[in-house]
């Protein structure tokens, strides 16, 4: 979650907690909310953005991104989330981000036909996945890999604001999309570097890994090794 005051957990909690309790009362689970929010945001991004309907697309995606944030509040209201729920939420976030940049990439390439902007959008698409992967892989290795100037909330604000303003009814400002995409492309590359540096400077990051012993096929299948009559299949 962003450290900006208007994106703080306390600010969101004042709005999301009552909504979370209401959704739990009608029988929805946090995982169901995650799937619903992701499906709707992906549909909005992949249907509206390629058609050049950037303002409606940004509104739809933003609404369901906020809706998807309720899953965490729901999990806390019922006493905690599950490990599967955490993995599902992270996976759905990556799918949603990919759909947003993929839909915009289609419009930029085939609607606007702006080759330079295609480059910026591709950078945003790739780095949005890499930034998250660095953190996940680092934490799986017991290292730190968080931080950076651009995290997911800021990334969504920049790209959706740029898309929406560029197609805003009556007072559209078309340069808003290129400005947003290039800003995001540059800051995302910087964030990748920052996270890699954080991993590199984590305690134990440069220690040599101890290679694991190779496992023979017959061992993996539970068959006894030849010459080991005392070992039985398990």
Swiss-Prot record:
It is found in: Cell membrane. It catalyses: a CDP-1,2-diacyl-sn-glycerol + 1D-myo-inositol 3-phosphate = a 1,2-diacyl-sn-glycero-3-phospho-(1D-myo-inositol-3-phosphate) + CMP + H(+); 1,2-di-(9Z-octadecenoyl)-sn-glycero-3-cytidine-5'-diphosphate + 1D-myo-inositol 3-phosphate = 1,2-di-(9Z-octadecenoyl)-sn-glycero-3-phospho-(1D-myo-inositol-3-phosphate) + CMP + H(+). The active site is at residue 93. GO terms for biological process: phospholipid biosynthetic process. One of its GO terms (molecular function) is magnesium ion binding. Mg(2+) 1 binds at residues 68, 71, 89. The chain crosses the membrane at residues 28-48, 54-70, 91-110, 116-134, 155-173, 179-197. Its EC number is 2.7.8.-. Its cofactor is Mg(2+). Keywords: Cell membrane, Magnesium, Membrane, Metal-binding, Transferase, Transmembrane, Transmembrane helix. Belongs to the CDP-alcohol phosphatidyltransferase class-I family. HAMAP family: PIP_synthase (MF_02241). This is Phosphatidylinositol phosphate synthase.
């Amino acid at each position: 979650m962003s450290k900006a005051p208007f994106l703080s957990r306390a600010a969101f909690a004042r709005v999301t907690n009552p909504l979370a309790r209401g959704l739990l009362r009608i029988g929805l689970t946090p995982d169901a909310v995650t799937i619903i929010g992701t499906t709707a945001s992906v549909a909005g991004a992949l249907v509206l953005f390629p058609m050049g309907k950037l303002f409606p697309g940004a509104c739809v995606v933003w609404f369901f991104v906020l809706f998807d944030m309720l899953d965490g509040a729901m999990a806390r209201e019922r006493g905690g989330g599950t490990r599967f729920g955490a993995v599902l939420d992270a996976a759905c976030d990556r799918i949603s981000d990919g759909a947003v940049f993929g839909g915009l990439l289609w419009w930029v390439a085939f609607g606007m036909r702006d080759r330079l902007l295609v480059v910026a959008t591709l950078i945003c698409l790739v780095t949005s996945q890499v930034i998250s992967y660095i953190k996940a892989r680092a934490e799986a290795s017991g290292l730190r890999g968080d931080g950076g100037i651009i995290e997911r909330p800021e990334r969504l604000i920049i790209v959706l604001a740029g898309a929406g303003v560029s197609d805003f009814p009556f007072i559209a400002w078309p340069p808003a999309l290129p400005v947003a995409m290039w800003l995001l492309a540059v800051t995302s590359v910087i964030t990748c570097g920052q996270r890699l540096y954080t991993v590199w400077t984590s305690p134990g990051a440069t220690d040599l890994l101890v290679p694991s012993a190779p496992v023979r096929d017959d061992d993996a299948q539970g068959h006894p090794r030849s010459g080991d009559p005392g070992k039985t299949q398990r």
